[in-house]
Amino acid sequence: MKIADSTVLVTGANRGIGKALVKEALRKGAKRVYAGARQPFAHADCRVTPVALDVTNAAQIRAAVERVDALDILINNAGISLMNDLSDRAARERLLAVNLFGTYDVTQAFLPVLARSRSAIVNVLSLASLAAVPFDPLYSISKAAAFSLSQSLHALLAGRGVSVHIVLPGPIDTDMTRNLDIPKASPESTARAILDGVEKEEEEIFPDPMSEAIAEGWRGSALKALQRQFAAYVEQTPVK
């Protein structure tokens, strides 16, 4: 899937990786980039269309679909981390609403547009999808659930010409990791690696040094083999 001359929608596009993805899509020659955010922002490039899009707001999702008449690449980037403990029910519900159900609801809403032609869905997750981060268990749970969703979508949509790419970054230098004193990749290099991975049609994209270090091991793992085995059971089936 080439970025040049494509139409792209990025959720969570107002900062961090999302903002960098908008810039990188433009650099690669995207024809139109819809920048979805809870607080839309103006952009100097006329190819960018700001869209009010809170991924937990059904009315805003419907309105966004009505604005987008064609779409080649949907990038589900919106996500949050609250650093709360497991006993906080409100935090559990909020994290799942954004990181899991937000991804699903946006995907489901745009699927009729995406399925009109060969297209791609890019779900920006985390290495916490594969192994829990003990000091942020709720975030890890939500991302693990979104990873399972993404694997399912990959199998279910393969017969409809819609590819699904799962992005598994390590720590990135964004507001979310501001207080973590650990090595971090830049949003710009991460965005570049993500879109390079989409163009190379990589199923899983490991876009930074920390994640890249485990890429080969993951692709040759028993868990990956099991995923392929389960995916082989799936016939072309509508998403439910």
Put a short name on every predicted segment.
Residues 77-83:
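Conserved NAD(P)H cofactor-binding loop of Rossmann-fold oxidoreductase domains
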Residues 166, 174, 178-217:
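C-terminal helical subdomain
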Residues 133-137, 180:
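Active-site loop immediately N-terminal to the catalytic Tyr-X3-Lys motif
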Residues 126:
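Residue(s) in the substrate-gating loop at a strand-loop-helix junction
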Residues 84-94:
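Substrate-binding pocket helix/loop in short-chain dehydrogenase/reductase
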Residues 14-15:
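Conserved glycine-rich cofactor-binding loop
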Residues 96, 107, 142:
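Active-site helix of classical SDR
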